[in-house]
Amino acid sequence: TGETFEENAITKASVPAKLGYIGIADDSGLCVSALNEAPGVYSARYSGGDDEDNNDLLLKELENKTDRSAKYVCVMACVFPDHQNDFTVRGECHGEILKERHGTAGFGYDPLFYYQPFDKTFAEIDLAKKNEVSHRSIAIKKFVEKIKEIM
């Protein structure tokens, strides 16, 4: 694991590029302000357990914190065999971490990630609506625009 989402996405996308193909990859996670942007690149294995364990640890670490602001981050990388047009794009979705889980849809930290414009957690939002505003959808839109510029 690299130290940043950018490093990880580039590392993943570099594998096909070494074989002569265009490599496209992403890395994503949750960054919580009060925890110095943790879990960050370690989001999937924050607790060493599953999603429930990760959520439990996050709640425990935020127990006495007043600042519960957080963001989901997705970085997409495109690596070319000749490295002439390599790029990354970053999508972010800002919210806050609730004190208890709400909703059952989604995965990961979605039951704790409150998105104010919809007044719901990501686990309570319809998937189509979530896909309009998520960090991944923002990154994908930026990625498509960048590809159009290059091609």
Predicted feature locations:
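Anionic-ligand binding patches
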Residues: 1-151
